[in-house]
From Swiss-Prot:
The lineage of its organism: Bacteria, Pseudomonadati, Bdellovibrionota, Bdellovibrionia, Bdellovibrionales. It catalyses: tRNA(Val) + L-valine + ATP = L-valyl-tRNA(Val) + AMP + diphosphate. It comes from the Bacteria. InterPro entries: aa-tRNA-synth_I_CS (IPR001412), aa-tRNA-synth_Ia (IPR002300), Anticodon_Ia_Val (IPR033705), M/V/L/I-tRNA-synth_anticd-bd (IPR013155), Rossmann-like_a/b/a_fold (IPR014729), tRNA-bd_arm (IPR010978), tRNAsynth_Ia_anticodon-bd (IPR009080), Val-tRNA_synth_C_sf (IPR037118). It comes from Bdellovibrio bacteriovorus (strain ATCC 15356 / DSM 50701 / NCIMB 9529 / HD100). This is Valine--tRNA ligase. CDD domains: Anticodon_Ia_Val, ValRS_core. One of its GO terms (cellular component) is cytosol.
Amino acid sequence: MKMSEQLSDRYNPADVESRTYEWWEKNGYFKAQDQSTKPPFSIILPPPNVTGFLHMGHALDHTIQDMMIRWKRMNGYNTMWLPGTDHAGIATQSVVERELKKDGVTRHDLGREKFVEKVWDWKHQYGNRIYGQMRRLGDSCDWDRAVFTLDEGVSKAVRKVFVSLHKKGLIYRGQRLVNWSGPLETAISDLEVEHKQIKGSLYHVKYPLEDGSGFLVVATTRPETMLGDSAVCVHPEDERYKHLIGKNVLLPLTNRKIKIIADTYVDKEFGSGVVKITPAHDFNDYKIGKTHNLEFINILTKKAEINENGGVYAGLKVQEARKRILEDLKAQDLLEKEEPHVHSVGHCSRSGAVVEPYLSEQWFVKMEALAVPAKRVAENGTIRFEPESWTKVYLHWLNNIEDWCISRQLWWGHRIPVWYCEDCNHQTVAETDVTACEKCGSTKLHQDDDVLDTWFSSALWPFSTMGWPNETETLKTFYPTSYLVTGHDIIFFWVARMIMMGLEFQRDVPFRTVYIHGLVRDSQGRKMSKSLGNSIDPVEMIEKHGADALRFTFAAHLYSGKDFKFSEQRLEGYRNFMNKVWNAARFALSNLSDFKAPTEGVKALPNKVHISVFDQWIITKLEEVTKTVEEAMEQERFSDASTALYQFIWNQFCDWYIEFTKPILNGNNAEEKAATQLVIAQVLNRIMRLLHPFAPFISEEIYQKLPIKGTACIVDQYPNARNDKEFLSLGSAQAALEIDIVKEVITAIRNIRGENRISPAVKLNVRLGVTNDQTQKILGNNRTALMTMGRLENMEIGPEGDMMKCAVAPVVVKDASVKVIIPLEGLVDFDEEVKRINKSIEKLTRDIGMLSGKLSNEKFVANADEEVVAADRALLAQSKVQLDSLRDALTRFQ
């Protein structure tokens, strides 16, 4: 990498990021080796849609994966992060159809072959733009291995799996109820159904009894579907209707006879306790229809309009039919009442139209047999979910699994490998294109028009991306993969199906660990969406604040499986952290200009005779944070790891250590200065390596400027206490205690200055009240640091003495106790201070009363978020301490 002699005055993320990423790629640091003596660690990237742009969910997902890959790479693993994109059948076809519509052309005008060519043209032009955005984030993928779900190799795998499952009787064609999008004229998956709360109506319709003795009232939100009713249903133990079970009612407006049946599915308490059963247009009714052997009457066309079974309403759109039917019911006095009703209605995420449960001929996978081994590997711990609570959710779904509809009425995707003979009607299922019927030899064949659900090819992703069905070295080395990172919304659509397919075709699980993260929400906790206008573009955030700041924001708020409230204000805070790191490195490097890099490099040790207590202290703190980060990363506690690093770098290294060492670096003791310079160089080296998985760009840039470094931070060893014993042994628990006492005393002095609004330019007189000889010695040994950093005129160490008209702050560090006493005579107006303190006491007393009342309310404690309750309790405790302190001050000032 082309490096300047020193770090620039200001940190410019855009300059550093583009240059650094290009250098990493050029040097092949992301590449995995199919054959290596290093232990393998692999992650398969959940393939984003080829139509997509990087969104906040991706950015979080990718940050977690890249942190793990970089951490494992630095720990000596042969890492492979394999990227890819999904052809996204419905999404991509919809995008291209919208483009054609601008020219007044439909896909049907073009025909299938030319339309698919258009989609490929679009894919070649726009399909890889998300890769560029992933690079902006810092994704260290092995780009040479990138795969597309319609690549030839994946297509080969898809066909092989289809044929194999079909031979085993696990794939079949049948008529079942599916989610149907009328505008798209295709079945869609549950994931493509968005449920919205709709303010509608509940219509109470009279169904006349066949014998003319009265009627039953049925409540429905969709009166138009009554055209497909096969029965009305009551609870078998409902005394109101027991005598009617087995009799008939006349379907309103048509007078078609339908039976009154009984089933425990019915809720006796809802509405009238009578429900209409429409097996061809409701998923619950479908099951009842199967149980009671009812007629399945489809009343919709593929465009979701009323078909010929709708009689006089045929040809109407659903909403038009509803309006007409309601008018006719009123005219015949068959509508008892209409009342407002809010209910959930499924909408197609692509077209926006209401999703219709629709009876159609589709291809399905039998899931029950495939689910058995998939349950076993979760139960016996072969696969681990993090957080563990998701294991129960996964198992619950598998225990209630239904067959999977895998066919879609689209043109873009993996076409179903089934050919129909026009002469003998035989079906040929094959891995390669068929030219003649395997039964009669006829060449009059046509391939099934449907394509496979996108999730079908995605289910094979962990092994199809590695070259299967060929026995490749990649497959031998990296399957099963080590880690899967994903959101909880696709556990069933993708994770479970990958596990099933991996066990079926590789006889092993596809991954060992499934890390489930929460959703990225806005600052108010709302889900990000276009309709709310609260979506945030991660690329825009990167351009404003830098990729490292965004990554660190995610890492610092990654609590096990919980949703994350994102705000730009938080991001700005971590941008400030990056600036802090940059400026600290600039200061340190400016004081290393005359430092001669030792030939031993990272193994070089300072002279123990000349090492300062401050050096010993920072090394002790470095050991602590190294152990904390290592343990947290091993347990996937990314927030704990990043927060510990943040606190060490900002608080210990930048705010304290650098300030402590300034007198040494500017002093005349050459031996002590040389020792401190070496410690600074070594600690900075380790900080950059510790920081790298979280903030790769800034850490690499600074690392390359260090006098002690390897080839590249990205491939240097990640710090751990076991391999760094010699350097870390220079730390000292006693030194750590000493400096912690000194820090707390300085902090107390600064707090008193701030609380009493005393200018930093005014040097203070301080008395440190202490009786313990050892503590007196510690304070005496660090007089220079206390005087300089406390901005003191004079400092006495000894008995407490008179504390009237003084500010007092107690300091306790382990067994050491110090009272910081600062005379305020001539520095503050005591009358004004007494007024201010009294006002503060009044306010705190009110606040404490409100908080106490809130926390004594059992309903609030039971229903509020745990974090809110904990925060209120902490605030109450803090407020009580502040109140005691103010009362003490009031006594001294009066």
